[in-house]
Amino acid sequence: MKNVLIIFGKPYCSICENVSDAVEELKSEYDILHVDILSFFLKDGDSSMLGDVKRGTLIGNFAAHLSNYIVSIFKYNPQTKQMAFVDINKSLDFTKTDKSLVNLEILKSEIEKATYGVWPPVTE
């Protein structure tokens, strides 16, 4: 069973789309799940299944710790049911306007370094 990369992006965001396209190149190593963050957090979105308290905590954590990320990536281990935050910003080159904005070698390194169960995320 492969680990899963969960990509939280915004609709109509060209950077999010380019990151998603680039990450697809890792699909032989990971299952990839794309999540529209706005739809996810809507009142009737998928996050509503968590209940009001957990949902509110999740929204608060996103706002507090991930608001400076255009797109967020987590890796998930389905066997242990643990998640790890992947610091994608280290792999992005914002001077590029296509999927080459993601340096896949750096991203792979960040995915491997991401530690399960650490929250809030440790960023440099």
Curated annotation (Swiss-Prot):
Induction: Expressed in the intermediate phase of the viral replicative cycle. Keywords: Disulfide bond, Electron transport, Host cytoplasm, Redox-active center, Transport. Disulfide bonds join 13-16. It comes from the Viruses. GO terms for cellular component: host cell cytoplasm. Its main location: host cell. InterPro entries: Glutaredoxin-like, Thioredoxin-like_sf. It is found in: Host cytoplasm. Pfam families: Glrx-like (PF05768). Homodimer. Glutaredoxin necessary for virion morphogenesis and virus replication. Functions as a thiol-disulfide transfer protein between membrane-associated OPG128/A2.5 and substrates OPG095/L1 or OPG053/F9. The complete pathway for formation of disulfide bonds in intracellular virion membrane proteins sequentially involves oxidation of OPG072/E10, OPG128/A2.5 and OPG088/G4. Exhibit thioltransferase and dehydroascorbate reductase activities in vitro. Belongs to the glutaredoxin family. This is Glutaredoxin-2. It comes from Vaccinia virus (strain Western Reserve) (VACV). The lineage of its organism: Viruses, Varidnaviria, Bamfordvirae, Nucleocytoviricota, Pokkesviricetes.
